[in-house]
Amino acid sequence: SLAKAMYRSYHRYMADYCSADPRRLKGLLLAPGADPQWAADTIRQHADEEWLSAVWPVLPEGLPVDDPDLEPIWQAMDEADLPIMHHSFFYEAPYFPGYRDIWGNVAVARTAAHVWGAQRLMAYVLVSGMLDRYPNLRVATVETGHGWLPHWIIRLTSQIDYVKGAVPADLKHTPMEYVQMGRVFCAIEQHEGPEMTKAVIDILGDGVLMYESDFPHPECYYPDSTDNVISWGPVIGEEALRKLMAGNAARYLRLLSDPWDGSRDGNGRSGNGR
């Protein structure tokens, strides 16, 4: 089909783009939820390629991330140690949850769109038992902000106790416990600043947040984006800064070699030990 041909073309493009130095240049694979078995086969086809570091599940509107039909995708990802990466959308498909209810103000809609898309996916991953069934799975949201995450995790943790019948009876951990286990990650947005970032670290720990530049989009602080975040060190702490700038991403992403190793034949695995 045309859709599958476009997916294949994208993956060839990513492999070619990253081939300049696949130790340092990484990409993600698109896994269409409309055809889970084809998506799983595609993951296995590319699983040993060094450029591949994460998978973006592309879900048709109305299909929840915990739908049983998607299990082949999670199985293939778990086998390859590939994490889930989520990026929300706004005015283009797949539209954000509630996109029909914006009341006409684009600024308000865009403020809500990326966050709510991330919140919904994160919540369903955490309360569905997916992380229990697939012990290598990790999940992250990117370009969705980060200040919302502690409130969402705390509230979600309380709600699965308040509405016990809404989650699997054999769910092994609470959302907060999955965070503390190193299964949840979130990329920062620089406009939220060092104080907000410190608050997230104080509540959830320093193993969650990851640096993000948003290059080459308009929200990037280019050419000062890296120096801008490094300057937050006195506020968030130097150890937390090191993890934010590199360590947490190295744990989250599937890395088949050490990006900081000068050799081209390294066999090191990602920092999470898997």
Model regions and ranges:
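Short coil/turn segments at secondary-structure junctions
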Residues: 1, 110-114, 232-233
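Surface-exposed, active-site-proximal loop segments in enzymatic domains
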Residues: 1-2, 37
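Acidic, glycine-rich flexible loop segments
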Residues: 3, 7
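Mid-to-C-terminal alpha-helical segments outside catalytic/metal-binding sites
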Residues: 12-16, 20, 41-45, 128-129, ...
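Catalytic pocket-lining loop regions of alpha/beta-barrel enzymes
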Residues: 18, 22-24, 31, 37, ...
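Conserved PLP-binding active-site segment of the aspartate aminotransferase-like
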Residues: 32, 214
